[in-house]
């Protein structure tokens, strides 16, 4: 594995190539895809990316479809909030 530094983090593997601003964008994406996310099923921070769009929880071993680089996409957050709002409106 390539050497990384404290300052640039995970994108240190690219060295001086591709420009600083592009490396900053890639860093945000790569940090997100390698981090653990909250599992809705068991309540632990164990959701890890297995492949593109496939997320698996290490605690309860449940598999969930999500975004390519992040578990929740912008569209899924919007849909969830809309469903929650409509559900609360019908209950009243």
Curated annotation (Swiss-Prot):
Zinc finger (C4-type) residue numbers: 39-60
Pfam family, one: Ribosomal_L37ae
GO cellular component: ribonucleoprotein complex; ribosome
Keywords carried by this UniProt record: Metal-binding, Ribonucleoprotein, Ribosomal protein, Zinc, Zinc-finger
GO molecular function terms noted in the UniProt entry: structural constituent of ribosome; zinc ion binding
InterPro entries documented for this protein: Ribosomal_eL37/eL43, Ribosomal_eL43, Ribosomal_protein_eL43, Ribosomal_zn-bd
Tree of life domain: Eukaryota
An example Gene Ontology biological process: translation
Protein family: Belongs to the eukaryotic ribosomal protein eL43 family.
Protein name in the entry: Large ribosomal subunit protein eL43
Gene, per the UniProt record: RPL37a
């Amino acid at each position: 594995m390539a050497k990384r530094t404290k300052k640039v983090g995970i994108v240190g593997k690219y060295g001086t190539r591709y420009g600083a601003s592009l490396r900053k964008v890639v860093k945000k994406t790569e940090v997100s895809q390698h981090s653990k996310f909250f599992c809705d099923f068991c309540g632990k921070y164990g959701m890890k990316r297995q492949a593109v769009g496939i997320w698996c929880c290490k605690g309860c071993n449940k598999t969930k479809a999500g975004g390519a680089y992040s578990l929740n996409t912008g569209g899924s957050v919007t849909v969830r909030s809309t469903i929650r709002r409509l559900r609360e409106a019908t209950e009243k």
